[in-house]
Amino acid sequence: PAMIFPEVLQKAQAELTNWLGQGVSVMEVSHRGKYFMELIAQAEKDLREVYHIPDNYRVLFLQGGARGQFAALPMNLIGEKGKALYLNSGHWSATAAKEARNFAEIDEITIVENGDHTRITNLDFSDIAEQYDYVHYCPNETISGVEIFDVPNVGNAVLVADMSSNVLSREIDISKFGVIYAGAQKNLGPAGITLVIIRDDLIGHARQATPSIWNYATQRDADSMINTPPTFAWYLCSLVFKHIQAIGGLKEIAKRNAVKAQTLYDYIDSSKLYRNV
């Protein structure tokens, strides 16, 4: 988990026991009631504007965290080719590949080289990517401290990204991805809700045995509410989206992140105890 904007927490605090003048908390209202349905519609609208999400992509607010998506992806995306390619840049991409192997044939390529300095070895897979139903990578490995700023070249293949720790950290071209997924607890809000942004044509191909809660088509048709959602987490995410809009969008967020990163690395570089690898 990471820091939530103080302004968001203050607004949530002010509304905690009396949301929209109803005399009750957002945690207590019906998730299918008029006010909460309006909230989730506005939250999606705000996220689409902030992240420049094209019209041919669906936005799902699910549960189960990124680990749930490790299983959902192969159940929904493995098709005629029968296999997927996972780019291993560290712990989380390796963990995703391990889970996916329970459901499909998975090939794995290591794309980091560890020496005096960790570096990315290759991001051009256009010559082999179309042999696979999708190519998966994690652009920010929090455990090993590796962030990949360039988008892998996979030709016309489907690119899937686990952006749990760098979603909404800067502007990106959504159209380069087939699926983006992220646990909320780093940049979106509190733990308990999971964002999935998926291109329309990738929905509706789940294997027959896919549980309904992991079936993207079922969740799309149910407005991400096949079961009772984490209403408070969804509400806080909606406040985060509003706040990002108010402070200038992702360009401003990227500037702030650059300052924070530089401050940290300057300290590490000047320290006699720590070293930057």
Feature-to-residue mapping (PLM):
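Conserved PLP-anchoring active-site segment centered on the Schiff-base-forming lysine
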Residues: I78-A94
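Active-site phosphate-binding strand-loop segment of PLP-dependent enzymes
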Residues: A100, I111-V167
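N-terminal "arm"/small-domain region of PLP-dependent enzymes with the aminotransferase-like
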Residues: P1-S30
